[in-house]
């Protein structure tokens, strides 16, 4: 939501919450206006005894306050004897040997039976509202929470914020700076203000600092101590903000609350971004149980619409639009979360049922009331005791109580990994290697290109096209260079820049790249047409986007060939922006096709330039070095096993990812073999990956069912698959039209003197391959215009059909 039209926040001395009383210790009371439990019927008591003249010493503070409020009946010193009334005599029942206790009253027998039964423990009582320490708290309220235990500054809560110029707090209207969040009297600003300005307002000191001028802010008078407000403590990570989910009282009388934490942008994995507001918070999925004693007072976290209208709602108002996942470190709009259907929670987490397990609040020292035994197993769970700490987030659940997660045994956590287990974890494709061998020359060229583009003031026409077969380290090399340049930037040896990474596979359509670029620069989401308009103005020298508009922008586009459209307008716009004066844009494109610029329109290929970088396939020595560098310090492979896997993959495609996958699968085979045989480290020869494990992994990877289907295809089916690989590599696209594929097949058959098939025959074979999920086909109504796509990597087709005895000429096209 655009908050640029939000009026500046006025600080008119209005408090957002009542002051806490200083006298009287904190005594929690249940709000009687919203009772959640009916008062149970008390057990019969003995006849009252005449009270003495001296007051009885109360056993608790609660009881003493109750005795002072309740008037005591005064009795006379001379007791008055009641008038005796004649009683009817009853015949005593005859004793019976079978029922010796029949003469006792029935009520006495019930009391005796109750004393003999074990007392049931009290259970926690849930409340909708709780009056605690002079404040009323309910579920759904936002509150400040102490972050440090025993901090004296947390108890300091000034009535109103002081002016940053005169350092006095009065009833005069104050205006807040949107940069430093400081309060200023209208008369103290130079020049003085007559009314609160609309829109964003920055104080003169922040404006001077933005302009690069050296300015000294006013200092408080000598001997005056500045007291920070709760808002300032929260934004400086000295307090927490939380949302109350539920309230209850434990059997020991202590009040607790389950809260959901808020965090400031600095506490996220991404840190504070330029688009974050100064008062912005993120709601998290982190839940915790805290004592009511740690809660200070209310604050108000509002939605964007509410925050826009809250121009005069005090100093404890904050803005929240997203929820932050502390596990996956991603963001989601609260509006999208609120629109989702609510799922039914576990019965143990439902609000308290007022009909069961009531704990009396007015008679804590009396005997436990009898309770009906619950029928649900969830109510029989025992609650853990809570430690008395103000700043510890104990009882974190993260919502795991809804799925009944179990605790991992300690022996599993303390298990020491073997060399084979370490090798399996290291060889994962998702594991980031410590170094990237065999690509030093290419990385130096990329680094020199980026540094030259950054040092150039105008960055005119800087485009770099990187191509190569899959699995040759193109993307990883560029990202390694950018990480190295980032360290130089942090040390102050490089000019500041912005880096944007986009993968074409993650875009729903090529036009969505405009939205991604604009959101990375501004932090706002708009449609792709508006984003294209704003980006064109930005790179043309018009209206700039973001606060870091003058910094160079390095745009990395992976899978560049997926941005091709019918008129190629997307690629034209992206490659045309760097050619404009003062655009400060550098484009690095990565694709698998070598001759992609030649296939583009002349106006696009001319803007792409002639600076290219080719990543050739790895040979077996380079693959062996890559695997050895990953396994450095882990003695889990035989040298011959690594060399055998490297030679096998280098003969096929030179894909490093395929080599790592084979070695990882071989390590799994070896680990399973060792655990099944029960060998220890004494027999070291069988505790490492040997040639047999590599052979088994290769057979599993290259002898998969779909590869067997390719090998057993008819003659024209094999020709169609090889022709698809050839066309996809030549065009650089992910799909091919049937008419182009058929023309290629007919041309090959004519050159190699094969029988020419008809279009219907080729179409039937494509349908058969589609039924086996070897290729993906569109609906058959399009006939010759339908698009075809390989469902498996082209390396599998190469491995399966490179040696076909019935079609020996097919290998020259692979």
Swiss-Prot record:
Biased amino acid composition, Low complexity: 51-62, 69-80
Sequence motif: Nuclear localization signal, positions: 105-112
Entry annotated with the keyword ATP-binding: yes
Biased composition (Polar residues): 1-15
A GO MF term: DNA replication origin binding
Induction: Reduced expression upon sucrose depletion-mediated cell proliferation arrest, and accumulates after sucrose treatment. Induced by gamma irradiation.
Domain BAH, residue spans: 218-335
GO CC list: nuclear origin of replication recognition complex; nucleus
Record's subcellular location: Nucleus
The organism's place on the tree of life at top rank: Eukaryota
Disordered, as annotated region: 1-127, 339-384
Main location: nucleus
Binding site for Zn(2+) 1: 177, 180, 203, 206
Pfam family, one: Cdc6_C
Compositionally biased residues, Acidic residues: 339-349, 360-373
Stretches for region Necessary and sufficient for ORC complex assembly: 433-804
Binding site for Zn(2+) 2: 163, 166, 185, 188
Binding, ATP: 468-476, 559, 592, 657
CDD domains referenced in this protein's UniProt entry, alphabetically: BAH_plant_2
Positions of the UniProt region annotated as Histone H3 binding: 157-181, 197-201, 310-315
Keyword terms: Activator, ATP-binding, DNA replication, DNA-binding, Magnesium, Metal-binding, Nucleotide-binding, Nucleus, Transcription, Transcription regulation, Zinc, Zinc-finger
Zinc finger extent (PHD-type): 160-209
Tissue specificity statement from the Swiss-Prot or TrEMBL entry: Expressed strongly in root tips and shoot apical meristem (SAM), and weakly in young leaves. Not detected in mature leaves.
Protein's job: Essential protein. Component of the origin recognition complex (ORC) that binds origins of replication. It has a role in both chromosomal replication and mating type transcriptional silencing. Binds to the ARS consensus sequence (ACS) of origins of replication. H3K4me3 effector that positively regulates the transcription of a subset of genes. Required for cell proliferation.
Stated family: Belongs to the ORC1 family.
Protein name (database record): Origin of replication complex subunit 1
Organism in which the protein naturally occurs: Oryza sativa subsp. japonica
UniProt gene name: ORC1
